[in-house]
Amino acid sequence: MARASCAWHSLWLLQWTPLFLGPSAVPPVWALNLDSEKFSVYAGPNGSHFGFSVDFHKDKHGSVSIVVGAPRALNASQEETGAVFLCPWKANGGKCNPLLFDLRDETRNLGFQIFQTFKTGQGLGASVVSWNDVIVACAPWQHWNVLEKRDEAEKTPVGGCFLAQLQSGGRAEYSPCRANTMSSVYAESFRGDKRYCEAGFSLAVTQAGELVLGAPGGYFFLGLLARVPIENIISSYRPGTLLWHVSNQRFTYDNSNPVFFDGYRGYSVAVGEFDGDPSTTEYVSGAPTWSWTLGAVEILDSYYQPLHRLHGEQMASYFGHSVAVTDVNGDGRHDLLVGAPLYMESRADRKLAEVGRVYLFLQPKGPQALSTPTLLLTGTQLYGRFGSAIAPLGDLNRDGYNDIAVAAPYGGPSGQGQVLIFLGQSEGLSPRPSQVLDSPFPTGSGFGFSLRGAVDIDDNGYPDLIVGAYGASKVAVYRAQPVVMATVQLMVQDSLNPTLKNCVLDQTKTPVSCFNIQMCVGATGHNIPQKLHLKAELQLDLQKPRQGRRVLLLASQQASLTLSLDLGGRDKPICHTTGAFLRDEADFRDKLSPIVLSLNVSLPPEETGGAPAVVLHGETHVQEQTRIILDCGEDDLCVPQLRLTATAGDSPLLIGADNVLELKIEAANDGEGAYEAELAVHLPPGAHYMRALSNIEGFERLVCTQKKENESRVALCELGNPMKKDTRIGITMLVSVENLEEAGESVSFQLQVRSKNSQNPNSKVVMLPVAIQAEATVELRGNSFPASLVVAAEEGDREQEDLDRWVSRLEHTYELHNIGPGTVNGLRLLIHIPGQSQPSDLLYILDVQPQGGLLCSTQPSPKVDWKLSTPSPSSIRPVHHQRERRQAFLQGPKPGQQDPVLVSCDGSASCTVVECELREMVRGQRAMVTVQVMLGLSSLRQRPQEQFVLQSHAWFNVSSLPYSVPVVSLPSGQARVQTQLLRALEERAIPVWWVLVGVLGGLLLLTLLVLAMWKAGFFKRNRPPLEEDEEEE
């Protein structure tokens, strides 16, 4: 029993469990003639799974209704028994009425046995089918049990079907798997066990009225088919009896072959003609778990002998979940379609994606077996369950080939579901959908879980489609619109002669080369309106941008024309002629490519603003082309002979520098005209085009652009349109090149002269290598602060206040500057300072202060704790620290005096060596070392009359440059810094007579100035007149 329970639950889950999925991609498609805007919607009770199964029903008066199954609907006692609804068709939907059946559990006694039926949870409406006046609705999970004393058959889902005769109101039931065999009979063997049939899980009916039921749980889940004429079911039915005999019912046989175990034969069923005998019917059965879940589809004859057995290609893909039979290629033979909604394909990331697949098997001529699928339709949406349902549609667009609908009930932009329409054709089916219907219901509706087509519900001559969405408990009816088959012709002359100016523009009176364009449009179709309004749009030189069109209409000087055409469905085509002209050759570049003219025909929207009532199909778009006649000889074919030479000079490119490279190029054409000729210079990484000049008068500055081609930059310069025969152009192109650190020892420029000619369009490619080198210039400068120092000997006794009062400090500074362009590694700087900080030395090293990353060491190290002796009253002190009165100092040696003494390390004097290192110095970087020294008092006292020049000396070198290219030279250099030590003269008293002469001279000058002013009347003053004086006057 555990095995039976597990298998039964797997059947239930695959049919009923919805998946909630994320967005998925749908390939772009064009719409055909199912009206996706004006569809009818029928709704059932919430949660009833209304739409789980659907079918059309046409009564004897020709009225069409829709039969809808709702397997989870509640009965009047609020028990979940399921229900079947009949919905009269209306354009705007309408109310659905339930068909009444006896849905009560029943118990009957027959001798020592008690028969029981259990209809709660039976799933009435899981499958429905209509034939003539009869509607068959099945409940595959209806349970049955037989009790006999202490034994029982066990309560199991045998399944059952209900039949409703609409005209007479009669009812009948059919449950082919009911039996009164006790479970003890099956204790040793399950052979022949029909207790788990789930009869009616799938359902089909032949044109003759033979009912075919699939029972995937029959024979202990091998599955079986049961078929019987509907008339026999009705005639054999005995109300009030739970177990009765139905004549002429036939079952498939049990099988002990392990490949059939748990195969679920009868999971899907269909009928068709596959043996070449139209008088017989063959039965198609899907077994999706046959041969350990590989799946199979069988085509059985009337004796249930297998004619064909088709195997799945992938384990657990559920090959055979759905089957459909129709003639898609118009050869008069039925073809087979099989769905495998769990098929997984391997994607680019090597992961498996569950997308679903549909297999098309075209029936060959003669007795050949169906084996290899003719076409594979694979879903594109992850977990969309493409192929869950397949429905023949009939000839949807009236082109002579039957079409099909394939459902992906959990596909679509948000997992709401989709139905894809595939058109039949002579080769089978179109590989891409002609129309995609997106679910109008919320996510999880299962839109497309059930499909039914091939019936004209609105009597317009085109078959319509029912789509069930059980998750939303709704059904949508899509009606097919009439299809207008268009025929379009466009005629234009083969070539245009630009030199033949046979027309004049009205506005500018400019002569132009003109030509005529003729357009013809026709339309035919089944049941189309007598008067048809079409819109025709003509586009000139469509492949060019709107502002670059080479031909325009004469009347409007525009590149497009829209016409309104009125024609009947059976009238002859309507033709219209218009004039156009070729623009002047100076207004465009392209003279070689064809001029493409396009004519597109479409249906304008209705005056109410809605979609048209018909659909336009067929030849709605046509293109023709013409060309411009060229001056290229009798064959009108120009064959250029393009040449190119180039040089780049001898100077290499330097890493780190702002290089400007001058390319000398000569382009020549020794053949016929080269149209749209251009110089193409492929620039290496780091190179940028600046400008290009030519040696042609009036053509000095070339028109060039920089573009990207194949991830590299290329400079394109126009050379003429056309570049005529025997043309020679000298070109100088300037290119900036930088960022060469990773370029290697050279960069290459690829040059070529190209044209748009069809024959021999380009010159040979010239590769121009340019060497790369590394170079750096490092500058060393020195400075002394102060540049000179004046000292003088003082008379009298002074007490020493501090070291700075009596001792002068000096600084020798050396600065390194990398001017570039490259970076240097391993820079080493040596500085020699005279003296080793001994008491007898003239200079005493105080400190070494490096900056800019330098690391320095001193040998010997400065003795910062060395004690100086106290200077005597006759010692000297720097005059720049304190000055009481003006002093004279010695600028240089006077006659009889000695030259200044040079104190440096060039001789045998003892010196201090400062050694500094810098690992890396980039372009523009600076580094500095400051050496602080002070003068030694004892040395100056010993040599009071001497002047000195204090000199330090520095050298530097570089070990390498961090590049794998040749180095021009390694930087090195030296510098010296000098400080002059000057002696001041002794102070002298000013003579008294100098003072007396100065005072007397000043008094004399003042007296003379006063006398001159008196003579000039400066001291005479006049009083201003009073008012009385003015009155007297």
Curated annotation (Swiss-Prot):
Residues 32-988 are extracellular. FG-GAP repeats lie at residues 35-96, 109-173, 184-237, 252-304, 305-370, 372-431, 434-495. GO terms for cellular component: cell surface; external side of plasma membrane; extracellular exosome; focal adhesion; integrin alphaIIb-beta3 complex. GO terms for molecular function: extracellular matrix binding; fibrinogen binding; identical protein binding; metal ion binding. Pfam families: FG-GAP, Integrin_A_Ig_1, Integrin_A_Ig_2, Integrin_A_Ig_3, Integrin_alpha. It is found in: Membrane. Ca(2+) 1 binds at E273, D275, D277, T280, E282. Ca(2+) 2 binds at D327, N329, D331, R333, D335. Residues 1015-1033 are cytoplasmic. Gene3D superfamilies: Bicelle-embedded integrin alpha(iib) transmembrane segment (1.20.5.930), Integrin alpha, N-terminal (2.130.10.130), Integrin domains. Chain A, domain 2 (2.60.40.1460), ntegrin, alpha v. Chain A, domain 3 (2.60.40.1510), ntegrin, alpha v. Chain A, domain 4 (2.60.40.1530). Disulfide bonds join C87-C96, C138-C161, C177-C197, C503-C514, C520-C575, C632-C638, C704-C717, C856-C916, C905-C911. Keywords: Calcium, Cell adhesion, Disulfide bond, Glycoprotein, Integrin, Membrane, Metal-binding, Receptor, Repeat, Signal, Transmembrane, Transmembrane helix. Its main location: membrane. A motif (GFFKR motif) lies at residues 1017-1021. GO terms for biological process: cell-matrix adhesion; integrin-mediated signaling pathway; positive regulation of leukocyte migration. SMART domains: Int_alpha (SM00191). Heterodimer of an alpha and a beta subunit. The alpha subunit is composed of a heavy and a light chain linked by a disulfide bond. Alpha-IIb associates with beta-3. Directly interacts with RNF181. Interacts (via C-terminus cytoplasmic tail region) with CIB1; the interaction is direct and calcium-dependent. Interacts (via C-terminus cytoplasmic tail region) with CIB2, CIB3 and CIB4; the interactions are stabilized/increased in a calcium and magnesium-dependent manner. Belongs to the integrin alpha chain family. This is Integrin alpha-IIb.
